[in-house]
Amino acid sequence: MINVRRIGLSSAIVLVLTGAVLVESPVADAARSGDLDEVRSLLRGGADVNAAQGDGMSALHWAAERGDMALMEVLLYAGAELEASTRIGHYRPLHIAARNGNVEVVIRLIEAGADINSLTDPSGSTPLHLAALSGNGATVRELVNAGADVDSREAEWQQTPLIFAASWNRLETVVTLLELGADPNLAAKSMDLQEMGRLDGEAQRRQQEVLKAFTNDGEWTPTPAQVQAAVIAGREAYSEGAEVEERRRSDRFQREVRIKSKGGLTPLLHAARQGHVETIEALLESGARIDQVGGGDGTTALLMAAINGQFDAAAALLRHGANPNIASSLNGVTPLFAAVNSEWQPRTRYPQPQEREGQEHGYLQIMEALLEAGADPDGRMTLHPWYMEYTGCGNSQCGLIDMKGATAFVRAAYATDVNAMRLLTKWGADPHVATEAPARRNRRTTQERIRESQVEALDNVEEFEELSDSAQATAVVTIWEDLPDSVKGSLPEEDIREAPAGFRQIVLEHAMRQDSVNAEKPDPSGLPPVPQGGPAVSAIHAASGVGYGEGFAGNAHRHAENGWLPSVRFLVEEVGMDVNLRDHNGYNSIHHAAARGDNELILYLVEKGGDVTAISRRGQTTADMANGPVSRVSPIPETVALLEELGSANSNNCLTCQ
């Protein structure tokens, strides 16, 4: 529940304009087309030199945009307003001239008295920020010589002009700013994403409150001016830092936050992210700290380059002595892991950088360069990275394995990348390191998670009472359907639907009793429990198709073409991995191969001693994994038949067929 100081609607409503006014701006119109004679004629006739167009562009703005010195002189002589601003962005003529890198216009406007520290709104950029983007060093020099702060900060992210120039690879202005004393190690601010999420929610609430007042609760459509007033009301939440109290979910449904903040980037980090090698060189030569980490997730320039597939930039940073072992403080990603992951980026909810395709250096070259520089081949992840995350599925990875505890070798195995695995073993990587097992409560199936959520919802009396009668009936019957037939017989469905509130408690008690009984049942795999932090998924599981039996989108992760059998053969014959090794859910490699219908790999594993009779912790045989183990996976009859022939039992529990 959100508790905030309520705002008065009047403060927002008074901002609404009473009506649109047709703007006449003949001088600005003529200036836009560069018609100097028409401008002179209009001014002689008494036209207003400062009458702006609808977007706020005045004649002086257009002179600055065009770089027309003759036009500018006429306008200045006629009394043109130096600080006139556009309606959107509040750009002054000096901002426009600086953005275009027109040094003559900038000099003239400064001579005329233009404010060199004027700010755009809401971004709060100075003319120097925009000059840095222009790439024109002379423009930058004139502004600084006139008194502009070389390390000024814009309002939104507190970025300096040097950050602007570095991020866009404006080498000339980068060098000029550095010569003029710009600090190459100043970072932008970091944003607390959790706090921002709370403020976003409050801003939306305020906007809706204002719109509701304007539209009489939806009876008519708001005008653009009214919408603007609602937006302004929402912005107040950010400026005030509204106090927000969240309703937190049960601890049983909490998971580690995978990204807490963003930002905090230096000019070097920006240049590394974009792969601007020349800018990187210039920054380092001027004292940029090569291993300075960003404020968002503790990423170095080398790691930033590797994550984004900027392998040429990574090579340059290594030549300058970047430390290959500084991992992200957020999730433990190392440059070595990032190099493998960049080559085999999964298709997640986040757009994945494709710059690796245009690099002179390949990922294997960068991996070897990192190892030669002393990279630890066994650096382990401390948290699954946020950019390998899906949404809209029964689990947060949507079928991708949880990379917590993974090494670069496990990541290469998951990509069925024999070349990367062989390179890593050459440099001493331990192929037997597995990912870390999560807490036992987080190993539930999707169905188990859904049921637990439904039971918890039924147990919340306040939320239940807020439901409609039909929703209450659905909530109770959903749990009732999973009860034993002997119990259901004494609780007729029609009675429950007629009076769900009266049956809520008794159905809930039966469900909890049943869950307690199920929890005491022995593990069908016969395996000892794996504690939290123990071994979860090993390289041989990753290379044989772990997770494919779940049928989520993430199971279609990118990997080397036709790499399943070669990868497993490498792990068994060259590394010596056990074909019967179980993952934390009790599956062996035959289970995973069966879920994909990979008969060739199944036969190889059996030839090497693989146990087709193994049963998982969920009671699934190897044949079951090929027989529609979940409703999203179609049965593969040929694989079922093969496994039965090899000795696997078949539970005949095709969930797809039901």
Residue ranges and their predicted role:
Residues 22-62, 267, 271, 279-282, ...:
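N-terminal segments that cap or nucleate solenoid repeat domains
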Residues 35-43, 68-76, 102-110, 136-144, ...:
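Ankyrin repeat structural motif
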Residues 24-29, 52-58, 85-92, 119-126, ...:
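Ankyrin-repeat boundary/"N-cap" motif
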Residues 612-653:
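Leucine-rich solenoid repeat scaffolds
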Residues 10-19:
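Bacterial N-terminal signal peptides
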Residues 29-33, 62-68, 96-102, 130-136, ...:
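Ankyrin repeat A-helix N-terminal signature
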Residues 206-249, 450-525:
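Long intrinsically disordered, low-complexity regions that are acidic and Ser/Thr-rich
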